[in-house]
Amino acid sequence: MATVLFVEDDDQVRVLAESYLEEQGHEVLSAGTAPGAVALLAKSPQLELLFTNVDLKGEIAAGIGLAHEAVNRRPNLKVLYTTERNLTDGMKARFVKNSAFLPKPYTVEQLLATLSVHFRISPQARRQRVSV
């Protein structure tokens, strides 16, 4: 099981994705803003993955700044970005190292594949860890 901080300003998307990730065995903390996410980050030493929208509440690239702050605090934190906007190469160059990008809209299957391929987080791995 992974502990995920999911940052999404669209309440409906946040609730649905949070519910699905929890069904898959993840512990999920969620926030709708970058400041809310920073507060959760400070209180949650067990976080393994930051899954953030690039743009939050009309703030262009707020998710990118959030990811940099989070990785500065926790160098081993994994980061997954998402957005429905077409990103320029310059914007993608600002992503933290060893991160991944999942464009919106995405399916549950695409989310699971991204977690598995880029972060080695899969339902089987979680079940094995829980049963050991």
Task: Annotate the PLM regions.
Residues 84-89:
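Negatively charged, flexible loop motifs adjacent to catalytic sites
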Residues 11-29:
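Two-component/phosphorelay signaling modules centered on CheY-like receiver
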Residues 42-45, 69-76, 94:
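Conserved phosphotransfer cores of two-component systems
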Residues 51-68:
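Conserved phosphotransfer microenvironments
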Residues 30-49, 57:
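Acidic, metal-coordinating helix/loop segments flanking the phosphotransfer/catalytic sites
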Residues 106-119, 123, 127:
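C-terminal output helix
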Residues 8, 83:
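Conserved acidic carboxylate
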Residues 92-102:
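As written
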